[in-house]
A protein has these predicted regions:
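Structured, basic alpha/beta domains of bacterial-type, RNA-associated proteins
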Residues: 1-12, 16-19, 23-118
């Protein structure tokens, strides 16, 4: 039975899932919006929301924690702390939106765009 199993597994191991979500989060922060499957967007959203909330208080500890979540990619963390987090200083959450799109042609997978709210 699947009771109390909240997260999607995407047919991948734990390490592969974490790598996928780290990569998607870094792409979203770099580009502002990404096209992905609906399930991946829904799984990515809470992770990114927590990262933005963490970046709103830019201490050394929070910077290091964010760096560990992005493969030590300094440019992504700098953009998150200096560009994205100040936009949402007055907002208490809900930094992203998911827009559902038509199914992908090859395998009919439901697609979605996840982007930062302006």
């Amino acid at each position: 039975m699947r009771h109390h199993n909240a997260n999607r597994k995407f047919g991948r191991s734990k390490n592969q899932r974490h790598a996928l979500l780290k990569g998607l989060a870094a792409s979203l922060i770099q580009h502002g919006r990404i096209l992905t499957t609906e399930a991946k967007a829904k799984e990515l959203r809470p992770n990114v929301e927590k990262m933005v909330t963490r970046a709103k208080n830019p201490t050394l500890a929070s910077r290091r924690l964010l760096l560990s979540g992005f493969y030590n990619n300094e440019s992504v963390v700098t953009k998150l702390i200096s560009d994205i987090a100040p936009r949402y200083a007055e907002r208490a959450g809900g930094y992203t939106r998911i827009i559902k799109l038509a199914a992908r042609k090859g395998d009919a997978s439901p697609m979605a765009v996840i982007e930062f709210v302006q």
